């Protein structure tokens, strides 16, 4: 990969986008951005607080604005929020401005990775099981992830290092 193209990681919460993104950026000597962290940095509050005060719609507006700004940069790795692909505008921009990598994971893996995390607003449910919420999100979002993915990586039990090097190999042939 001689020219440093933007790399955009998409997928559901708990897929490993932030972790893989940081390691991938480090290996490729690229700048790393996490859209949720950028929102928190710019607002001074965490994502859960924004959801509580502004609702999901308010959060999505902020997310769309920040992602639109970040993807104008060159030679970056961006880990997007799981719901960012709900915006047609964001899907179009991601597709046209870099390589989109979908980190596909099962609901079972998501449950393991998210069960102790109280910072995920969509999982703060009263009368619904977290598994049901994740299954519903997957039903609606997985087709959107698939529709814009240039590369799909099935997240399994491989190490972070193995996944990162696999992605780099795929990018070199892309």
Swiss-Prot record:
GO terms for molecular function: ATP binding; magnesium ion binding; shikimate kinase activity. Pfam families: SKI. ATP binds at residues 14-19, 120, 158. PROSITE patterns: SHIKIMATE_KINASE (PS01128). Its main location: cytoplasm. Binds 1 Mg(2+) ion per subunit. Its cofactor is Mg(2+). The keyword Nucleotide-binding applies. Its EC number is 2.7.1.71. It catalyses: shikimate + ATP = 3-phosphoshikimate + ADP + H(+). It is found in: Cytoplasm. GO terms for cellular component: cytosol. It comes from the Bacteria. Keywords: Amino-acid biosynthesis, Aromatic amino acid biosynthesis, ATP-binding, Cytoplasm, Kinase, Magnesium, Metal-binding, Nucleotide-binding, Transferase. Belongs to the shikimate kinase family. HAMAP family: Shikimate_kinase (MF_00109). Monomer. This is Shikimate kinase. The gene is aroK.
């Amino acid at each position: 990969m001689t020219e440093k193209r933007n790399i955009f990681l998409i997928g559901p919460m708990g897929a490993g986008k932030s972790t893989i993104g940081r390691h991938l950026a480090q290996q490729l000597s690229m700048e790393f951005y996490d859209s949720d962290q950028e929102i928190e940095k710019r607002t001074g509050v965490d994502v859960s607080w924004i959801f509580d005060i502004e609702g999901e719609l308010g959060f999505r507006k902020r997310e769309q604005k920040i992602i639109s700004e970040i993807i104008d940069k060159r030679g970056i790795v961006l880990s997007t929020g799981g719901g960012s692909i709900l915006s047609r505008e964001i899907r179009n921009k991601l597709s046209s401005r870099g390589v989109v990598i979908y980190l596909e994971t099962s609901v079972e893996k998501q449950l393991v990775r998210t069960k102790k995390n109280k910072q995920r607003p969509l999982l703060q449910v009263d009368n619904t099981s977290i598994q049901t919420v994740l299954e519903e999100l997957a039903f609606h979002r997985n087709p959107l992830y698939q529709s814009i993915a240039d590369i799909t990586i099935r997240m399994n039990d491989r190490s972070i290092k193995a996944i990162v090097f696999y992605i780099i190999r795929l990018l070199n042939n892309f």
